[in-house]
């Protein structure tokens, strides 16, 4: 279906946070959205929403509510059980202290708690991680906003999961994997 008739005159689309930053800087009346991790060095001003300043602390306290989550989506069916087990291990890794620390270091806004499991405390639940998985490739794609985070997580998990390979293909939030 053609949505062009619904677009407002002057509306533009961009491919990345960097493109959005440049577009807004070059448009006196521009407004857009970027990842909060990109805001600090952008030279742009974050929008106060309902009187609350856009800070990581306020996002974590849930007082700044003009936010969006990044969601991983996975297949409902797999070509083999090994890929399913590796994805299960990856999803578990996301909830560990190590996984959360990596997400945080790549601009993710989340808390790492002492009560979060460590990878060492849960890895025995994922026997696939003890096998040689160097002949298996898992595909990642989606938003360029999380590409560095996903690449860092995949690099870590590859080392922890029998050298499984990860293929990265990012185009934007709406594209998923191409």
Model-derived features: where do they sit?
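Exported/periplasmic ABC-transporter solute-binding proteins
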Residues: 1-178
């Amino acid at each position: 279906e053609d949505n062009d008739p619904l677009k407002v005159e002057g509306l533009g689309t961009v491919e990345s946070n960097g493109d959005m930053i440049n577009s807004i800087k070059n448009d006196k009346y521009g407004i857009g959205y970027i990842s909060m991790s990109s805001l600090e060095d952008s030279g742009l001003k974050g929008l106060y929403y309902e009187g609350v300043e856009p800070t990581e602390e306020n996002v974590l306290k849930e007082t700044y509510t003009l936010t969006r989550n990044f969601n991983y989506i996975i297949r409902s069916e797999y070509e083999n059980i090994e890929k399913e087990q590796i994805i299960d291990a990856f999803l578990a890794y996301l909830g560990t202290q190590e996984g959360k620390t990596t997400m945080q270091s790549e601009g993710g806004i989340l808390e790492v708690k002492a009560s979060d499991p460590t990878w060492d405390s849960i890895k025995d639940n994922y026997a696939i991680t003890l096998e040689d998985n160097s002949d298996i490739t898992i595909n990642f794609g989606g938003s360029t906003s999380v590409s560095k985070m996903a690449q860092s997580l995949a690099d870590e998990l590859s080392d922890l999961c029998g050298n499984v390979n990860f293929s990265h293909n990012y185009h934007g939030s709406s594209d998923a994997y191409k």
